């Protein structure tokens, strides 16, 4: 990929612009027109998505997928879809492309993107994709790079404040903490029937399942962190911000206009316009920020991150010094504190490891082990212990099967809360990464399958848990039916349970309908379908009541009159103690039937009190006179 002999006619081009401008489509099309090619994506999710598209176009045998956790490399693969970190550096390709190069300014991963800008070249064509904010710095690095600016295909407009409960369907709400995402999702479930969840902590499989829940129309709302700002092309009309402050690893800070635009740009696709706004008055964006977002005019990047990739493995000190080498441009910031460097520093201080670093090969092995990611982002002693044990085992051969089994199997559980499942997924993803290092294991394919199976199992369980917690399942099923058939079929069973499209939505208790669904627009539509069949049943029940035998009625000590064990009326104060009145339950479904029911009430009701003043008699009424049965 970094060939020494690049054709002098090889072109370098940058395609820059906001989201929804067809940049990735262009790069994929260009790659597949070459005899070989590779694209580096910022997310595993994106690499997988475009891998699947390429497979459809040119066949599975011609396309490879390479990420930290997944490697599918057919023997004669021509086209590679990779995460930027996992691009095979030793290979040469006719076409090379790097997506989202403005991430060179990201404090955590930026140095990787900067390295690819500096060094990744196709022998015939190189295409960089990203935001226009990186243009000035890119042209300083590559003066001969041809730059094309792509305009957004639709408009993005600010519509101000709109409360969460008033958001229209096909809206996304963005927050920047897991508890806040959960709080909003629960509110939307109550008021709107449910929402899908997208967070960076989700595994790709869980995220895809949640996105499908939204895309298929089963729910109309999406609650997300800024994880939706990249790589998720969805049918979103409006993006609402519940906050504009995020924790960037060091401290809370306000989002920049460009960052807001990256997220808001998910609204509207292709030529369909989108909108963005906030959910509270105090969040209103500044006029200048709004103008920048609507016109896609942002301040250019001033700095990007860099770290030396020409490392010296002659000794530990030489390796550390080479990592600390100064950048080639004054607008590049030297990256310090990367996870691999922190792990190297920690492990090399351990005597059990330091004393074993006796060659370039050993030091190189240690450095490769330090690349093992900590997906939990906790950098705990558990992660250091994992790296240390891995190093010790690889020094004497391959990773021990029994040890691998014990490490992987501990995560093969689906009990616990949502956060527990998220933690297990983070841990098993680390093992998915390790098992993809084939030269570290004797039975790599087997262990890859084991780790992937557990990750998939946990991911599916997490999706189910999120759906159970944040989605009214009845709404989901009925919403899908509504989209397919428009008309909903409702029935009442003999036990009073009311079903719409075979989903129980409530029960008819006497003359009262008790719904089980949450409030909201979809619930209202579904309950309307249910209520259409209720008036006839109410009239039937009134007719049955009027001809019922005495045994069908009961009079309780609380004054309630029950018919067939359902409360239908209550005694209320009348003209005197011996002349109470009957008040029929206030049911929205009785209508004219209620008038008929009231006529059976008479003024000459007699209540017999005995002993301690408790009512010992049942009042059973029928026809024109009350009927009293003494219980003695």
Feature annotation, model-predicted:
Residues 4, 8, 68-78, 132-170:
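Interdomain hinge/linker at the junction between the two RecA-like core domains of SF2 helicases
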Residues 35-50, 126-129, 135, 166-191, ...:
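Conserved strand-helix element at the start of the C-terminal RecA-like helicase core
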Residues 37, 102-157:
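Post-DEXD/H (motif II) to motif III coupling segment of the RecA-like Helicase ATP-binding lobe
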Residues 54-93:
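Inter-Walker segment of RecA-like/P-loop motor cores
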Residues 64-66, 71-73, 183, 194-225:
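Conserved helicase ATPase core of P-loop NTP-dependent helicases/translocases
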Residues 122-136, 216-217, 221, 234-297:
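Conserved segment of the helicase C-terminal RecA-like domain
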Residues 157-174, 258-261, 266-349:
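C-terminal helicase lobe
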Residues 357-599, 603:
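Extended, charged helical/alpha-beta scaffold domains that provide interaction surfaces
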């Amino acid at each position: 990929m970094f060939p020494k002999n690049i054709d002098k006619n090889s072109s370098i081009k940058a395609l820059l612009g906001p989201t929804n401008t067809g940049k990735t489509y262009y790069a994929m099309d260009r790659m597949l027109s070459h005899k070989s090619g590779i694209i580096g994506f910022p997310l595993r999710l994106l690499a997988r998505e475009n891998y699947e598209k390429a497979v459809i176009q040119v066949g599975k045998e011609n396309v490879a997928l390479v990420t930290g956790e997944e490697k599918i490399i057919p023997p004669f693969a021509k086209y590679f879809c990779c995460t930027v970190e996992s691009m095979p550096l030793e290979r040469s390709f006719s076409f090379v492309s790097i997506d989202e190069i403005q991430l060179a300014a990201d404090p955590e991963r930026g140095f990787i993107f900067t390295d690819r800008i500096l060094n990744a070249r196709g022998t015939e064509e190189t295409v960089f994709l990203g935001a226009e904010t990186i243009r000035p710095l890119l042209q300083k690095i590559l003066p001969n790079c041809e730059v094309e600016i792509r305009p957004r295909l639709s408009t993005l407009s600010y519509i101000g404040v709109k409360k969460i409960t008033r958001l229209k369907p096909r809206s996304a709400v963005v927050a920047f903490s897991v508890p806040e995402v959960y709080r909003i999702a629960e509110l939307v479930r109550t008021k709107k029937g449910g929402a899908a969840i997208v967070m960076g902590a989700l595994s790709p499989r869980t995220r895809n399942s949640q996105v499908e829940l939204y895309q298929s129309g089963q729910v109309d709302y999406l609650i997300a962190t800024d994880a939706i700002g990249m790589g998720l092309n969805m049918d979103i009309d409006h993006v609402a911000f519940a906050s504009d402050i995020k924790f960037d690893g060091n401290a809370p800070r306000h989002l920049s206009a460009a960052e807001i635009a990256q997220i808001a740009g998910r609204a509207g696709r292709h030529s369909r316009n989108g909108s963005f706004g906030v959910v509270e008055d105090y969040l209103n964006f500044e006029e200048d920020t709004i103008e920048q977002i609507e016109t896609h005019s942002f301040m250019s990047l001033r700095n990007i991150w860099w770290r030396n990739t020409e490392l010296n493995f002659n000794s530990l000190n030489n390796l550390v010094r080479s990592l600390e080498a100064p950048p080639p441009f004054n607008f590049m910031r030297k990256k310090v504190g990367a996870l691999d460097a922190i792990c190297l520093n920690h492990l090399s201080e351990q005597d059990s490891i330091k004393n074993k670093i006796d060659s370039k090969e050993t030091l190189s092995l240690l450095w490769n082990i330090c690349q093992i990611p900590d997906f939990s982002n906790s950098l705990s002693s558990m992660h250091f212990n994992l790296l240390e044990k891995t190093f010790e085992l690889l020094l004497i051969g391959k990773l021990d099967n029994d040890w691998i089994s014990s490490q992987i199997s501990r995560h093969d559980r689906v009990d616990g809360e949502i956060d527990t499942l998220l933690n297990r997924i983070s841990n098993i993803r680390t093992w998915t990464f390790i098992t993809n290092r084939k030269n570290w294991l004797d039975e790599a394919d087997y262990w890859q399958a084991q780790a992937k199976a557990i990750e998939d199992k946990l991911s599916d369980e997490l999706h189910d848990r999120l759906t159970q917690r944040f989605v009214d399942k009845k709404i989901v099923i009925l919403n899908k039916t509504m989209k397919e058939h428009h008309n909903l079929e409702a029935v009442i069973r003999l036990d009073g349970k009311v079903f719409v499209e075979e989903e129980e939505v409530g029960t008819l208790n006497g003359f009262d309908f008790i719904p089980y669904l949450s409030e909201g627009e979809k619930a209202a539509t579904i309950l309307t379908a249910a209520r259409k069949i209720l008036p006839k049943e109410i009239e039937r029940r009134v007719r049955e009541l009027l001809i019922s035998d005495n045994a069908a009625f009961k009079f309780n000590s609380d004054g309630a009159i029950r018919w067939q064990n359902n409360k239908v009326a209550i005694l209320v104060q009348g003209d005197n103690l011996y002349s109470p009145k009957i008040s029929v339950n206030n049911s929205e479904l009785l209508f004219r039937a209620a008038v008929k029911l009231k006529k059976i009430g008479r003024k000459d009701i007699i209540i017999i009190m005995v002993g301690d003043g408790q009512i010992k008699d049942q009042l059973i009424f029928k026809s024109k006179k009350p009927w009293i049965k003494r219980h003695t």
